[in-house]
Design a protein with these regions (language model features):
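A gly/proline- and charged-residue-enriched helix-loop-helix capping module
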Residues: 88-134
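Active-site environment of non-heme Fe oxygenases that use a 2-His-1-carboxylate facial triad
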Residues: 1-49, 56-57, 61-83, 121-267, ...
Length: 329
Protein backbone atom coordinates (compact mmCIF):
# COMPACT_ATOMS: atom_id res chain seq x y z
CA UNK A 1 0.00 0.00 0.00
CA UNK A 2 1.36 3.40 -0.96
CA UNK A 3 -1.52 5.63 0.09
CA UNK A 4 -0.82 9.31 0.69
CA UNK A 5 -2.40 10.91 3.75
CA UNK A 6 -3.97 14.20 2.68
CA UNK A 7 -3.93 16.93 5.31
CA UNK A 8 -3.90 20.33 3.58
CA UNK A 9 -5.25 19.89 0.07
CA UNK A 10 -8.33 22.02 -0.68
CA UNK A 11 -9.97 25.10 0.77
CA UNK A 12 -9.81 26.25 4.41
CA UNK A 13 -12.69 28.53 5.31
CA UNK A 14 -12.00 31.63 7.38
CA UNK A 15 -14.13 32.15 10.48
CA UNK A 16 -16.03 34.90 8.67
CA UNK A 17 -16.76 32.72 5.65
CA UNK A 18 -17.70 29.78 7.89
CA UNK A 19 -20.30 31.90 9.67
CA UNK A 20 -21.62 33.12 6.34
CA UNK A 21 -21.93 29.57 5.01
CA UNK A 22 -23.83 28.47 8.11
CA UNK A 23 -26.31 31.36 7.77
CA UNK A 24 -26.88 30.46 4.12
CA UNK A 25 -27.14 26.76 5.00
CA UNK A 26 -29.84 27.35 7.60
CA UNK A 27 -31.84 29.29 5.02
CA UNK A 28 -31.36 26.55 2.42
CA UNK A 29 -32.46 23.82 4.85
CA UNK A 30 -35.59 25.76 5.83
CA UNK A 31 -36.68 26.35 2.24
CA UNK A 32 -36.85 22.65 1.21
CA UNK A 33 -36.14 23.81 -2.34
CA UNK A 34 -37.55 21.70 -5.15
CA UNK A 35 -35.27 23.25 -7.79
CA UNK A 36 -31.83 24.83 -8.01
CA UNK A 37 -33.47 28.11 -9.02
CA UNK A 38 -35.19 28.22 -5.61
CA UNK A 39 -31.75 28.72 -4.04
CA UNK A 40 -30.17 30.98 -6.66
CA UNK A 41 -29.85 33.96 -4.31
CA UNK A 42 -28.08 31.83 -1.68
CA UNK A 43 -25.75 30.25 -4.25
CA UNK A 44 -24.73 33.69 -5.50
CA UNK A 45 -23.95 34.78 -1.94
CA UNK A 46 -21.62 31.91 -1.10
CA UNK A 47 -18.06 33.04 -0.21
CA UNK A 48 -16.60 34.05 -3.57
CA UNK A 49 -13.33 32.11 -3.40
CA UNK A 50 -15.02 28.88 -2.36
CA UNK A 51 -17.73 29.35 -4.96
CA UNK A 52 -15.16 29.94 -7.70
CA UNK A 53 -13.08 26.90 -6.74
CA UNK A 54 -16.12 24.62 -6.69
CA UNK A 55 -17.27 25.87 -10.09
CA UNK A 56 -13.78 25.19 -11.47
CA UNK A 57 -13.85 21.70 -9.97
CA UNK A 58 -17.25 21.02 -11.54
CA UNK A 59 -15.74 21.43 -15.02
CA UNK A 60 -14.23 17.93 -14.71
CA UNK A 61 -10.61 18.81 -15.41
CA UNK A 62 -9.29 17.69 -12.02
CA UNK A 63 -6.49 15.13 -12.07
CA UNK A 64 -6.96 13.91 -8.50
CA UNK A 65 -10.77 13.85 -8.73
CA UNK A 66 -11.60 15.30 -5.33
CA UNK A 67 -11.83 18.65 -3.57
CA UNK A 68 -11.63 19.13 0.20
CA UNK A 69 -13.33 21.91 2.16
CA UNK A 70 -12.29 22.41 5.79
CA UNK A 71 -13.73 24.55 8.57
CA UNK A 72 -17.48 24.27 7.94
CA UNK A 73 -19.71 24.59 11.01
CA UNK A 74 -21.81 21.53 11.88
CA UNK A 75 -24.04 23.01 14.59
CA UNK A 76 -25.51 21.20 17.56
CA UNK A 77 -25.97 17.46 17.09
CA UNK A 78 -27.98 14.72 18.73
CA UNK A 79 -26.39 11.39 19.59
CA UNK A 80 -25.19 9.39 16.60
CA UNK A 81 -28.24 7.23 15.73
CA UNK A 82 -28.26 3.45 16.19
CA UNK A 83 -30.41 2.94 13.10
CA UNK A 84 -30.93 4.65 9.77
CA UNK A 85 -34.07 6.75 9.81
CA UNK A 86 -35.45 8.77 6.91
CA UNK A 87 -35.45 12.51 7.54
CA UNK A 88 -32.71 12.49 10.17
CA UNK A 89 -31.73 16.15 10.71
CA UNK A 90 -33.99 17.10 7.78
CA UNK A 91 -33.86 20.83 8.50
CA UNK A 92 -30.43 20.86 10.13
CA UNK A 93 -27.85 23.29 8.76
CA UNK A 94 -25.70 20.38 7.56
CA UNK A 95 -28.48 19.45 5.12
CA UNK A 96 -28.40 23.02 3.84
CA UNK A 97 -24.60 22.92 3.43
CA UNK A 98 -24.78 19.78 1.30
CA UNK A 99 -27.70 21.13 -0.71
CA UNK A 100 -25.85 24.34 -1.55
CA UNK A 101 -22.68 22.54 -2.61
CA UNK A 102 -24.61 19.95 -4.64
CA UNK A 103 -26.70 22.63 -6.37
CA UNK A 104 -23.63 24.70 -7.19
CA UNK A 105 -21.98 21.66 -8.81
CA UNK A 106 -25.20 20.51 -10.52
CA UNK A 107 -28.45 19.46 -8.87
CA UNK A 108 -28.96 17.63 -5.58
CA UNK A 109 -30.65 14.31 -6.44
CA UNK A 110 -31.76 11.06 -4.85
CA UNK A 111 -32.85 7.69 -6.26
CA UNK A 112 -36.37 6.31 -5.85
CA UNK A 113 -35.09 2.79 -5.23
CA UNK A 114 -32.28 3.78 -2.85
CA UNK A 115 -33.43 4.69 0.66
CA UNK A 116 -36.86 5.69 -0.72
CA UNK A 117 -35.39 8.66 -2.56
CA UNK A 118 -33.82 10.31 0.49
CA UNK A 119 -31.64 13.25 -0.64
CA UNK A 120 -29.23 13.38 2.29
CA UNK A 121 -27.87 10.01 3.45
CA UNK A 122 -26.64 9.20 6.92
CA UNK A 123 -23.30 7.37 7.03
CA UNK A 124 -22.76 5.82 10.43
CA UNK A 125 -22.41 2.31 11.86
CA UNK A 126 -25.53 0.38 12.81
CA UNK A 127 -25.50 -2.49 15.33
CA UNK A 128 -25.67 -5.82 13.52
CA UNK A 129 -24.62 -4.31 10.18
CA UNK A 130 -20.93 -3.72 10.93
CA UNK A 131 -19.86 -6.04 8.09
CA UNK A 132 -22.16 -4.65 5.41
CA UNK A 133 -20.37 -3.04 2.48
CA UNK A 134 -22.45 0.13 2.62
CA UNK A 135 -22.95 3.19 4.79
CA UNK A 136 -24.20 1.24 7.82
CA UNK A 137 -20.97 -0.76 8.14
CA UNK A 138 -17.60 -0.17 9.77
CA UNK A 139 -15.41 -2.66 7.90
CA UNK A 140 -13.07 -1.58 5.12
CA UNK A 141 -14.92 -0.58 1.96
CA UNK A 142 -12.82 -0.97 -1.20
CA UNK A 143 -12.71 1.38 -4.18
CA UNK A 144 -15.93 2.07 -6.04
CA UNK A 145 -17.60 4.74 -8.10
CA UNK A 146 -21.04 5.48 -6.70
CA UNK A 147 -24.07 3.67 -8.13
CA UNK A 148 -21.89 1.98 -10.74
CA UNK A 149 -24.83 -0.09 -12.00
CA UNK A 150 -27.01 2.92 -12.81
CA UNK A 151 -27.39 4.68 -16.20
CA UNK A 152 -27.76 8.05 -14.39
CA UNK A 153 -24.85 7.81 -12.00
CA UNK A 154 -24.10 10.88 -9.87
CA UNK A 155 -21.52 13.24 -11.31
CA UNK A 156 -20.38 14.20 -7.80
CA UNK A 157 -20.85 13.05 -4.26
CA UNK A 158 -20.17 14.97 -1.07
CA UNK A 159 -19.26 13.53 2.33
CA UNK A 160 -19.56 15.92 5.27
CA UNK A 161 -18.12 14.85 8.62
CA UNK A 162 -20.27 15.58 11.67
CA UNK A 163 -18.32 13.32 14.05
CA UNK A 164 -15.00 11.53 13.76
CA UNK A 165 -14.48 7.96 14.97
CA UNK A 166 -13.20 7.61 18.52
CA UNK A 167 -9.62 6.79 17.54
CA UNK A 168 -9.48 9.33 14.71
CA UNK A 169 -8.24 6.71 12.25
CA UNK A 170 -11.15 6.18 9.84
CA UNK A 171 -10.11 7.51 6.44
CA UNK A 172 -12.06 8.26 3.30
CA UNK A 173 -9.86 6.75 0.59
CA UNK A 174 -9.92 8.40 -2.85
CA UNK A 175 -8.08 7.22 -5.97
CA UNK A 176 -8.13 8.80 -9.43
CA UNK A 177 -8.07 6.88 -12.69
CA UNK A 178 -6.11 9.79 -14.15
CA UNK A 179 -3.32 9.14 -11.65
CA UNK A 180 -3.56 5.33 -11.88
CA UNK A 181 -3.62 5.09 -15.69
CA UNK A 182 0.17 5.27 -16.07
CA UNK A 183 0.51 2.11 -13.97
CA UNK A 184 -1.55 0.02 -16.41
CA UNK A 185 -0.12 -1.71 -19.48
CA UNK A 186 -1.43 -0.94 -22.96
CA UNK A 187 -3.06 -4.37 -23.03
CA UNK A 188 -4.84 -3.78 -19.71
CA UNK A 189 -6.04 -0.38 -20.87
CA UNK A 190 -7.46 -1.86 -24.08
CA UNK A 191 -9.33 -4.60 -22.23
CA UNK A 192 -10.74 -2.17 -19.66
CA UNK A 193 -12.14 -0.04 -22.51
CA UNK A 194 -14.10 -3.04 -23.86
CA UNK A 195 -17.79 -3.53 -22.87
CA UNK A 196 -17.30 -6.97 -21.31
CA UNK A 197 -17.99 -5.98 -17.69
CA UNK A 198 -21.18 -5.94 -15.65
CA UNK A 199 -21.91 -4.40 -12.26
CA UNK A 200 -24.34 -5.87 -9.74
CA UNK A 201 -26.75 -3.59 -7.94
CA UNK A 202 -25.30 -2.47 -4.59
CA UNK A 203 -27.03 -3.73 -1.47
CA UNK A 204 -28.53 -0.29 -0.84
CA UNK A 205 -30.56 -0.75 -4.07
CA UNK A 206 -31.40 -4.43 -3.61
CA UNK A 207 -32.44 -4.90 0.02
CA UNK A 208 -36.04 -5.60 -1.03
CA UNK A 209 -35.26 -7.67 -4.15
CA UNK A 210 -35.77 -11.42 -3.75
CA UNK A 211 -33.20 -13.80 -5.20
CA UNK A 212 -29.84 -12.94 -6.73
CA UNK A 213 -28.97 -9.29 -7.10
CA UNK A 214 -29.57 -8.02 -10.65
CA UNK A 215 -26.75 -6.52 -12.71
CA UNK A 216 -26.28 -3.73 -15.21
CA UNK A 217 -25.85 -4.36 -18.89
CA UNK A 218 -22.34 -4.84 -20.25
CA UNK A 219 -20.14 -1.75 -20.02
CA UNK A 220 -16.49 -0.66 -20.24
CA UNK A 221 -14.59 0.25 -17.07
CA UNK A 222 -12.43 2.96 -18.68
CA UNK A 223 -13.58 5.51 -21.25
CA UNK A 224 -12.36 8.82 -22.65
CA UNK A 225 -8.84 9.79 -23.72
CA UNK A 226 -6.01 11.43 -21.80
CA UNK A 227 -6.19 13.81 -20.06
CA UNK A 228 -9.99 13.37 -19.94
CA UNK A 229 -10.10 9.81 -18.63
CA UNK A 230 -13.15 8.45 -16.82
CA UNK A 231 -14.02 5.28 -14.92
CA UNK A 232 -17.03 3.11 -14.07
CA UNK A 233 -15.86 0.59 -11.49
CA UNK A 234 -16.77 -1.08 -8.21
CA UNK A 235 -14.22 -3.53 -6.84
CA UNK A 236 -17.02 -5.36 -4.99
CA UNK A 237 -19.58 -5.67 -7.79
CA UNK A 238 -17.91 -5.12 -11.20
CA UNK A 239 -16.99 -8.46 -12.79
CA UNK A 240 -16.37 -10.15 -16.13
CA UNK A 241 -16.75 -13.72 -17.35
CA UNK A 242 -13.52 -13.25 -19.34
CA UNK A 243 -10.33 -14.29 -17.54
CA UNK A 244 -8.17 -11.62 -19.21
CA UNK A 245 -10.68 -8.92 -18.30
CA UNK A 246 -10.78 -10.17 -14.70
CA UNK A 247 -7.02 -9.86 -14.48
CA UNK A 248 -7.25 -6.32 -15.86
CA UNK A 249 -9.74 -5.46 -13.11
CA UNK A 250 -7.27 -6.69 -10.50
CA UNK A 251 -4.55 -4.60 -12.10
CA UNK A 252 -6.77 -1.52 -11.93
CA UNK A 253 -7.50 -2.15 -8.24
CA UNK A 254 -3.76 -2.41 -7.55
CA UNK A 255 -3.04 0.76 -9.53
CA UNK A 256 -5.72 2.68 -7.64
CA UNK A 257 -4.22 1.48 -4.37
CA UNK A 258 -0.83 2.82 -5.44
CA UNK A 259 -2.16 6.35 -6.02
CA UNK A 260 -4.72 6.45 -3.19
CA UNK A 261 -5.14 9.58 -1.06
CA UNK A 262 -6.34 8.92 2.49
CA UNK A 263 -8.43 11.78 3.86
CA UNK A 264 -9.11 11.58 7.60
CA UNK A 265 -12.16 13.80 7.92
CA UNK A 266 -12.63 15.88 11.06
CA UNK A 267 -15.92 17.55 12.02
CA UNK A 268 -16.59 20.34 9.53
CA UNK A 269 -14.62 18.71 6.70
CA UNK A 270 -16.44 18.10 3.41
CA UNK A 271 -14.83 16.04 0.64
CA UNK A 272 -16.37 16.37 -2.82
CA UNK A 273 -15.56 13.54 -5.25
CA UNK A 274 -15.90 13.59 -9.03
CA UNK A 275 -17.65 10.24 -9.44
CA UNK A 276 -16.40 9.67 -13.00
CA UNK A 277 -12.74 10.40 -12.24
CA UNK A 278 -12.14 9.01 -8.78
CA UNK A 279 -13.22 5.91 -6.91
CA UNK A 280 -13.56 6.10 -3.16
CA UNK A 281 -13.66 3.78 -0.19
CA UNK A 282 -13.29 3.68 3.58
CA UNK A 283 -10.79 2.23 6.01
CA UNK A 284 -12.05 0.13 8.90
CA UNK A 285 -12.82 1.48 12.36
CA UNK A 286 -14.29 0.16 15.61
CA UNK A 287 -17.72 1.53 16.60
CA UNK A 288 -18.79 1.71 20.24
CA UNK A 289 -22.51 2.45 19.74
CA UNK A 290 -22.38 4.95 22.58
CA UNK A 291 -23.93 7.92 20.78
CA UNK A 292 -20.58 9.41 19.74
CA UNK A 293 -19.63 7.17 16.80
CA UNK A 294 -18.41 8.42 13.44
CA UNK A 295 -21.18 10.19 11.51
CA UNK A 296 -20.97 11.54 7.98
CA UNK A 297 -23.72 12.89 5.75
CA UNK A 298 -23.68 12.14 2.01
CA UNK A 299 -25.25 13.82 -1.00
CA UNK A 300 -25.30 13.25 -4.77
CA UNK A 301 -25.15 15.89 -7.50
CA UNK A 302 -26.09 15.44 -11.16
CA UNK A 303 -25.10 18.10 -13.68
CA UNK A 304 -27.86 17.33 -16.16
CA UNK A 305 -31.00 15.21 -15.88
CA UNK A 306 -32.64 14.11 -19.17
CA UNK A 307 -36.01 15.72 -19.74
CA UNK A 308 -37.75 12.33 -19.96
CA UNK A 309 -36.30 11.36 -16.56
CA UNK A 310 -37.47 14.64 -15.03
CA UNK A 311 -41.01 13.97 -16.27
CA UNK A 312 -40.90 10.49 -14.70
CA UNK A 313 -39.65 11.64 -11.30
CA UNK A 314 -41.95 10.54 -8.45
CA UNK A 315 -41.20 13.83 -6.70
CA UNK A 316 -38.78 16.72 -7.25
CA UNK A 317 -35.10 15.79 -7.33
CA UNK A 318 -35.76 12.01 -7.07
CA UNK A 319 -34.74 9.94 -10.12
CA UNK A 320 -37.21 7.23 -11.18
CA UNK A 321 -36.74 3.61 -10.09
CA UNK A 322 -34.53 1.43 -12.29
CA UNK A 323 -37.38 -0.92 -13.19
CA UNK A 324 -39.02 2.05 -14.92
CA UNK A 325 -35.99 3.08 -17.00
CA UNK A 326 -34.03 -0.15 -17.57
CA UNK A 327 -32.85 -0.24 -21.17
CA UNK A 328 -33.52 3.43 -21.87
CA UNK A 329 -29.79 4.19 -21.66
Amino acid sequence: MHATTTTRRGHQLSETDARKMWTLALSAAARKAENVSDLSDLLLNMPSELRSELIDFSAGASRQGFFLIRGLPVGELPATPLEHRAGELAEHGSAGLLTLVADLLGTLVGYEDEKDGTLIHEVHPVPGEEHRIENSGSVAFDFHTENVHHPLRPDFLGLLCLRQDHEGVAATRVASVREAYALLTDGQRDVLRTPVFKSAYPTSFSRNIAGPRPSSGLHPVLFGQEPDLFMRFNSHTTTSDDAVASRALRALSEALEEVCHEVVLAPGDLVVVDNHIAAHGRSAFTPRFDGTDRWLRRCYSLRSTPRWAERMMPRPRVLPALMKITGVL
